[in-house]
Amino acid sequence: MNAEQALRLTNRVMIGFDVALASGALFAPPATLAALGHAEPSPDAEHLFRRCAPIWFTFAAAHALAAARGRPEDWWALAWLRGTELATDIVWSRSRAFERRGSRAALWLAGAANAAMAAGFAWLARK
């Protein structure tokens, strides 16, 4: 598998990941937060997390569009979207509510993954 194939596969995987994350946030926020290592959320934390569902559905749609069309502007849009997520999970990891061992490190890795995807999708846009 070459770099382009790996990036295209990653893009397809992210469609499912973002749909799952958005669906979990919308329909089962406590369970989804628990899967991420979060303590039992307060009602306001549940609603704040639930309001992120449209964001992740938008990410899934952008990934799906790039998978279907593959135009340079689609890849640039994904690079930009993933770039906006570089620090969000790192900032979120500072919450004391992430109690499960490894959950904070996983959020830092999510930031690194977003950086890698942003760079990779930008590369695809220029290819």
Located regions from the model:
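Short amphipathic, positively biased membrane-proximal segments
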Residues: 1-127
